[in-house]
Amino acid sequence: MAGFSGKKHIVSALMRRYTDRVPVTILIGPYCSRLTKYSVKEILQDAKKSTEAHLAFYDRFAPDSVIIYNDIYLEVEALGCELEFPENDISHPRTVLLDEKSRLARLKVPDPKRDGRIPYFIEVCERVSAQVRKTTALGLGHSGPWNIAMHLR
């Protein structure tokens, strides 16, 4: 299967078609920062630095897919939860957003164009995709409803 790109390996496997090897992907998360001069904190707050770190990971390991998954607290931050950003570890909530049940009714649906770091995450996805989408499958990760509910309390 000469000339088979990582993307073709992933798509073939998902469609249950022949591929000459098992596709490989690695969920590295924010620790791709270690392949650059940036700290985890920097790539969690700067789309250009995060893009550079994800592309450094792609260039070094050539996975069949790149998964952009920086932070499990992205959604709760957009809802108003204040986060702490250690220099070389993932962020975590500084306070509990729903310390009182009555606050639940006051939550607003976040605007992905302006709330929290959702605009940053969209920018990272667009920047990385522009560089690798022709040869590599691209995925992204985010928290689902149960994780979000747990992180709010």
Residue locations for each model-derived region?
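N-terminal basic, low-complexity leaders that serve as flexible interaction/assembly modules and, when applicable
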Residues: 1-87, 126-127
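Active-site-proximal, glycine-rich beta->alpha crossover segments in alpha/beta enzymes
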Residues: 80-153
